[in-house]
Curated annotation (Swiss-Prot):
GO terms for molecular function: ATP binding; cysteine-tRNA ligase activity; metal ion binding. Binds 1 zinc ion per subunit. GO terms for biological process: cysteinyl-tRNA aminoacylation. Keywords: Aminoacyl-tRNA synthetase, ATP-binding, Ligase, Metal-binding, Nucleotide-binding, Protein biosynthesis, Zinc. It comes from Encephalitozoon cuniculi (strain GB-M1). It is an enzyme of class 6 (ligase). It catalyses: tRNA(Cys) + L-cysteine + ATP = L-cysteinyl-tRNA(Cys) + AMP + diphosphate. The keyword Ligase applies. Pfam families: tRNA-synt_1e. This is Cysteine--tRNA ligase.
Length: 480
């Protein structure tokens, strides 16, 4: 099978052929959250879509992926939140770290191979900065340490994801810098801020240095893939590249940089600073985790995406189509025979399946084109459904098993439990139905009464979003 994967590389601004540096091993790093608040659906999109890319690499293309994520648990925003709430920094970061991973589990995002916390890496961060200083690429000023961009540019290529003005102040005091574009590696501590010892005095790590140190500690001096949201491209990712190339004295540090596009609401980027964000938990009150993933899959991962109400309904419709088909197909398994005569309709469906398999494979290799994959999957379901009464159960199951293979790669779990407020009522309804049937059997009531009761349960369960369908193979339960 051709494994020539092409990915949009933010460094080259082109779709490049991806080949790991070392055999079958892929070293992949993603910037995790700064844990001072609840994650929003913009974050959800980033982590879900990189979960999909990771699954394509590991499950579909069979690469051995080492996937590292950091947690930023020292930051100005965390300090501000602790001061606002009266909680300690540890209480703030613990709360939102736990909430983040709960959200990721709900969204069926696989756990990283390794998770790193900044607070556990301060000593290594200090040593990393000391080497940059020794290499002549960092300098101390009034207890803080800055990256010397002018010195760096004389040796290495920079910038890569340049902003409009190229200035990276990040709120630092320019009077302490040699150049306004220099960025902080070590911040001197102010009163009532967390502080760690260093040869420059008490301070704490700057934002960018954290990821450089943690990624290289786990994955070594170079990466195959670095991933994150496009809002981190400048200055964060650009500065990461500069730090690592200066430290290891080689380039390129990252082979392929991947950035998800912005998630927009009413044409505006969703962000906490604009106060137009919807948390993941709030979003999941109106759409299931699987439906949210379906919605994301219908948009190319590296393009901007609009989040609109009508899109939620579309995702719900597509999700039900896929998993209702899987449910109906699975109900046929008991009647599928290993040796069946193929009719023309069976051959037609299997021929179309072959075309779809080729198209899906090509789409996955072409920058992980999930919209094209979803389109072909739905078309295959429609094609099969139109002939389902004239083809054998075995043919239906061949289609179903392939669709399950691909939906598994996309992270659409067939076993996802769809919780709803009516679940307890459904359980009570079925309990009452069972008790009624037992009582009717004890009274030896006529056969027609049992059929009436079966019709009653079929009508009653519709109120909770389920349909019981009878066919020649028996009865199946599916969602409306």
């Amino acid at each position: 099978m051709d494994k020539t994967l092409k990915l949009y590389n933010s460094i080259t601004r082109t779709i490049d052929i991806f080949t790991p540096r070392k055999g079958n091993e892929v070293k992949m790093y993603i910037c995790g959250p700064t844990v001072y608040d609840s994650s929003h659906i913009g974050h959800a999109r980033t982590y879900v879509m990189f979960d999909v890319i990771r699954r394509v690499l590991s499950d579909y293309l069979k690469y051995n992926v080492r996937f590292v994520m950091n947690i930023t648990d020292i930051d100005d925003k965390i300090i501000a939140r602790a001061n606002e709430t009266g909680a300690s920094m540890e209480e703030v970061t613990r709360k939102y770290t736990e909430e983040f991973f709960e959200d990721m589990k709900t969204l069926n995002v696989r756990s990283p191979s390794f998770v790193t916390f900044v607070t556990s890496y301060v000593d290594k961060i200090v040593k990393f900065i000391e080497k940059l200083e020794a290499n002549g690429l960092a300098y101390e000023s009034r207890g803080s340490v800055y990256f010397d961009l002018n010195s760096y540019q004389q040796r290495y290529s920079y910038p890569l994801f340049k902003s409009k003005d190229g200035i990276n102040s990040e709120g630092d005091e320019n009077k302490d810098k040699r150049s306004p574009c220099d960025f902080v590696l070590w911040k001197r501590s102010k009163e009532n801020e967390p502080r760690y010892e260093s040869k420059w005095g008490h301070g704490r790590p700057g934002w960018h240095i954290e990821c450089s140190v943690m990624s290289s500690d786990i994955l070594g001096e170079d990466l195959d893939i670095h991933a994150g949201g496009v809002d981190l491209a400048f200055p964060h990712h650009e500065n990461e590249i500069a730090q690592c190339q200066a430290y290891f004295m080689q380039e390129p540090w990252v082979k392929c940089f991947l950035h998800t596009g912005h998630l927009n609401i009413s044409g505006l980027k969703m962000s906490k600073s604009l106060k137009n964000f919807t948390t993941i938990k709030e979003a999941l009150k109106t759409i299931s985790p699987r439906q949210l993933r379906v919605l994301f899959l219908h948009h190319q991962w590296n393009k901007d995406m609009n989040y609109e109400k009508e899109h939620l309904k579309f995702a719900e419709t597509i999700e039900k189509k896929i998993f209702n088909f899987m449910s109906v197909a699975e109900s046929m398994r008991k009647n599928a025979l290993a040796f069946e005569t193929l009719e023309n309709a069976d051959r037609e469906v299997l021929r179309e399946l072959g075309n779809v398999q080729e198209a899906v494979h090509a789409a996955l290799l072409d920058n992980v084109d999930t919209p094209a994959v979803m389109k072909r999957i739905v078309e295959m379901i429609n094609f099969t459904n139109a002939r389902i009464k004239t083809i054998s159960p075995s043919t239906v199951l061949v289609v179903k098993d392939y669709i399950k293979e691909i939906t598994d790669v996309l992270g659409l779990s067939e076993e996802e439990r769809q919780e709803s407020p009516g679940e307890d009522l459904i359980a009570q309804l079925l309990s009452n139905f069972r008790e009624s049937i037992r009582e009717m059997a004890r009274r030896k009531e006529p056969y027609s009464k049992f059929l009436e009761k079966c019709d009653w349960i079929r009508e009653s369960i519709k109120d909770y979003g389920y349909i019981i369908e009878d066919n020649s193979e028996g009865s199946i339960l599916r969602k409306k």
